[in-house]
Amino acid sequence: MQQQPSGQQSAPTSPYAPVDQSGVTLDGLDIGEVVAEIHSQGYAVVEEFVGAEVIEPIREAFNTEVPITEMRFLGSTTGNTWRAHNLLAKTRAIDELLLDPRLRAIVEGVIGKYHQINIATLFNTLPGEFKQDLHQDDGLWPIPRPHPSFLCNLLIAFDD
């Protein structure tokens, strides 16, 4: 038990619990607000999170270093979505993005400080592709709902 200033005791906090990011601001981004939005609606949109100085080297690496393949499996039959898996094994261009302190703080606010990158994938969705409905990517794990968050996805749109 932890001792509170008033003398009351509270239950110990799990080291795996999400980090309270209330009032935390990094580089002008209110981390607590973003995390609260994720907890409230399941996602948050952060406009202009990444600037051109980060995007351009990644785009260049995707055009020169990373083999991209057509994705006719995994739900797409049009041939209008191309995909590259295991980006961390293929390029160092995304390191800066994945180590961004704002991103790490958001993830810690959602799933806790003990997290790891499991998958880094590129999607190139071309004109004519069917829209994909919002969905949760935790279906691979047969855990009954509701359950604590154990997955936090990031999607960065390079183009409008």
Specify the residue positions occupied by each region the protein language model found.
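Non-heme Fe(II)-dependent double-stranded beta-helix
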Residues: 2-41, 46-146
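Short, conserved beta-strand element in jelly-roll/cupin
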Residues: 144-160
